[in-house]
């Protein structure tokens, strides 16, 4: 793989030990195989990212999982906050309160962690981090220079798109809203002009709490989770408990 040009390896670990990981995955031996892959990556000097799924079941094990991560020599720990759809529909999402506490814990870890910590489908981590930085008396110029302050907001249909096995085009792999098909449509025109793509890039079209949130450009909420829960990808992310003031809608 390295000879073919692979520059980074990404593996999934959903438990702090073999018992927890294999039980969650439902396949005995996967933890051991993953640990072997970690060793292979290090032998080839491949930077390594570990992905962990955040669910109601895995949440209590995350502190122990973090201790494991510190022993693996990784460059990044990416926590994917479950969206109950597709293959994940049989799993339980965490609630808004747990999400908020987890984001604060991750921010605390980020100060001393030997690797980068990031979230997927939990952009409200950026809002938590900014609130914490302001509470620590960081000025906004300094915050803007951090990785959080340079955040890109919603990426679905905004710099990325997803093409399924049958050619169907979606704004992202987690947002299954059909916009066309590469066999019959111009993919560039779909990205540039399809109403789904243009509305995702225009945060003034967002609704509810996300639509009036001062952090919408840096966060924007999970469009995939909004779609899974409400059927409308422009609605509020139900996992974020933040209630913005009515007067804080983004500028047109």
Protein language model annotation of sequence segments:
Residues 71, 163-164:
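Short, acidic, Ser/Thr-enriched surface-loop or helix-capping motifs
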Residues 49, 78, 116-121, 162:
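A structural signal for short, well-ordered beta-strand segments and their strand-loop junctions
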Residues 21, 68-87, 103-107, 120-123, ...:
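Iron-sulfur cluster-binding electron-transfer modules in prokaryotic oxidoreductases
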Residues 98-143, 168-220, 225:
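C-terminal accessory region of radical SAM enzymes
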């Amino acid at each position: 793989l390295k000879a073919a040009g692979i520059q980074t390896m990404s593996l999934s670990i959903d438990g702090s030990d073999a018992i927890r990981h294999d039980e969650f995955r439902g396949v005995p031996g996967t933890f051991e195989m993953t640990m072997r892959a970690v060793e292979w990556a290090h032998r080839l000097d491949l930077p390594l990212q570990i992905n962990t799924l955040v669910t109601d079941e895995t949440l209590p094990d995350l502190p122990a999982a973090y201790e494991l991560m510190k022993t693996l020599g990784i460059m990044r720990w990416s926590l994917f906050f479950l969206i109950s759809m597709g293959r994940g529909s049989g799993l339980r999402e965490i609630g808004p309160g747990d999400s908020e506490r987890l984001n604060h814990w991750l921010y605390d870890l980020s100060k001393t962690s030997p690797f980068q910590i990031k979230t997927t489908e939990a952009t409200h981590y950026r809002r938590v981090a900014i609130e914490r930085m302001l509470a620590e008396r960081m000025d906004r110029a300094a915050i803007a220079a951090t990785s959080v302050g340079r955040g890109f907001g919603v990426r679905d249909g905004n710099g990325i798109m997803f093409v399924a096995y049958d050619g169907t085009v979606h704004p992202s792999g987690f947002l299954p809203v059909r916009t066309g098909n590469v066999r019959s449509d111009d993919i560039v025109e779909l990205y540039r002009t399809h109403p789904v793509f243009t509305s995702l890039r225009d945060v003034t079209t967002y609704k509810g709490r996300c639509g009036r949130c001062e952090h919408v450009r840096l966060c924007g909420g999970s469009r995939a989770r909004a779609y899974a829960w409400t059927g409308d990808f422009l609605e509020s992310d139900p996992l974020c408990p933040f209630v913005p003031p009515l007067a804080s809608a983004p500028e047109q």
